[in-house]
């Protein structure tokens, strides 16, 4: 129980340190707006908390606005702002309706006006005006998710199928200025890829999109194929962008929490980008290599793994990472691995991630659960639920990638 208690404290402290509220307030100090209208558009999993912070700072200057976040992530009204919840990771009808409202609010603005655009991860699904039939867009998104395409590859395709992605939302807002505050959820903070870059010049090309479509065998209608050949904006003169929050801050906060609990933290990487199972196996190997240590150690890896779906089970990349590690640390005393999505949701589940220790494999075996078979069916959620290994945080109000931690207590 000691290791699980340590895990829960690390999670709580790390998430508290990466809330976007303070960063939004800093960005809005001095009220950096012109004399015209100011319209707020907040999009993403952290949209509600970012919008609340903005209203605390400049609420008196706002001439309306809209918040678009994931189902279950809104926490109540914010002044006169429209609050909308929509589908993630696949856009739904709520996504399309809310985006149309945002486009209407920002239509017909003048050069004296400003759009305060608050953007966080998840925006690729939550902010969408498709240039192809909605059903085809949803099918393409599902195909990319199932194939294990990474976030950059997914967004390269989605930009070209959208009227708001890849800088096209900023074009729509022109000649108004777009003042954009971005919470990063992609390794390296590429502004044109975060939420598919609605208000940032696009660095990807049509050739990139064609290559990705061929690589993953996407079935595209003639209409969608034509969209891949239409280039996105490469220059936007009406946009000012500030980036705040990233996986680096999440790792630093988790490291500080580990140190406060008596562990010596070791940051392995803040650019983790591989199969979830590979990451879990790697952390297990690190655990075995350091069993002779005479001091408590915490090894941290931040980033975002991927999962290639081979089964029909339920889970997410963080749960799959943790369960993969369970096999490798089986029998190791005072050793645990946990992995967490900072937004509080891991895959299409109500869990944020998973926790395993040296006894997890044996506890599952006593229930007739074999880890290899579970992973083959991508059913980590039910296995972790059976052994008390699910991590639940609820919606966190932030979204800065994932962090996985190996704890060795001495």
Annotate the PLM regions.
Residues 69-112, 153, 157-158:
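Glycine-rich oxoanion-binding loops at beta->alpha junctions
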Residues 158, 176-179, 201-282, 286:
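Accessory alpha-helical/coil subdomains and C-terminal extensions
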Residues 133-222, 228:
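Internal gly/pro-rich beta-alpha loop/helix module
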């Amino acid at each position: 129980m000691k290791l699980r208690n340590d895990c829960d404290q690390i999670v709580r402290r790390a998430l508290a340190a990466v809330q976007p509220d303070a960063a939004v307030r800093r960005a809005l100090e001095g009220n950096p707006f012109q004399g015209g209208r100011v319209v707020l558009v907040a999009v993403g999993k952290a949209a509600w908390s970012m919008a609340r912070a903005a209203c605390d700072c400049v609420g008196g200057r706002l001439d309306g606005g809209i918040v678009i976040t994931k189902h279950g992530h809104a926490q109540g009204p914010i002044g006169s702002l429209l609050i909308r919840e929509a589908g993630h990771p696949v856009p739904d009808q709520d996504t399309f309706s809310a985006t149309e409202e945002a486009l209407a609010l920002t239509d017909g603005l003048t050069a004296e006006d400003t759009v305060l655009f608050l953007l966080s991860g998840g925006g690729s699904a939550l902010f969408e005006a498709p240039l192809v039939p909605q059903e085809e867009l949803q099918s393409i998104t599902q195909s990319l998710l199932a194939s294990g395409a990474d976030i950059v590859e997914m967004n390269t395709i989605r930009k070209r199928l959208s009227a708001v992605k890849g800088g096209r939302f900023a074009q729509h807002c022109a000649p108004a200025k777009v003042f954009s505050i971005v919470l990063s959820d992609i390794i390296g903070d590429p502004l044109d890829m975060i939420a598919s870059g609605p208000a940032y010049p696009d660095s990807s090309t049509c050739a990139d999109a064609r290559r990705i479509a061929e690589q993953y065998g996407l079935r595209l209608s003639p209409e969608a194929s034509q969209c891949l050949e239409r280039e996105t904006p490469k220059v936007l003169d009406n946009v000012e962008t500030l980036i705040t929050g990233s996986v680096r801050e999440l790792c630093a906060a988790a490291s500080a929490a580990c140190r406060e609990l008596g562990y010596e933290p070791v940051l392995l990487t803040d650019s983790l980008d591989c199969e979830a199972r590979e990451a879990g196996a790697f952390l297990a190997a690190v655990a075995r290599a350091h069993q002779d240590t005479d001091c408590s150690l915490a090894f941290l890896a931040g980033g975002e793994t991927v999962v290639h779906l081979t089964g029909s089970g339920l889970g997410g990349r963080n749960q799959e990472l943790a369960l993969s590690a369970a096999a490798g640390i089986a029998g190791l005393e005072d050793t645990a691995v946990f992995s967490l999505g900072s937004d509080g949701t891991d895959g299409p589940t109500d869990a944020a991630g998973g926790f395993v220790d040296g006894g997890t494999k044996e506890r599952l075996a006593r229930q007739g659960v074999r880890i290899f078979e579970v992973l083959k069916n991508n059913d980590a959620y039910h296995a972790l639920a059976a052994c008390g290994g699910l991590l639940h945080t609820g919606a966190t109000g932030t979204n800065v990638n994932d962090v996985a931690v190996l704890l060795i207590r001495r």
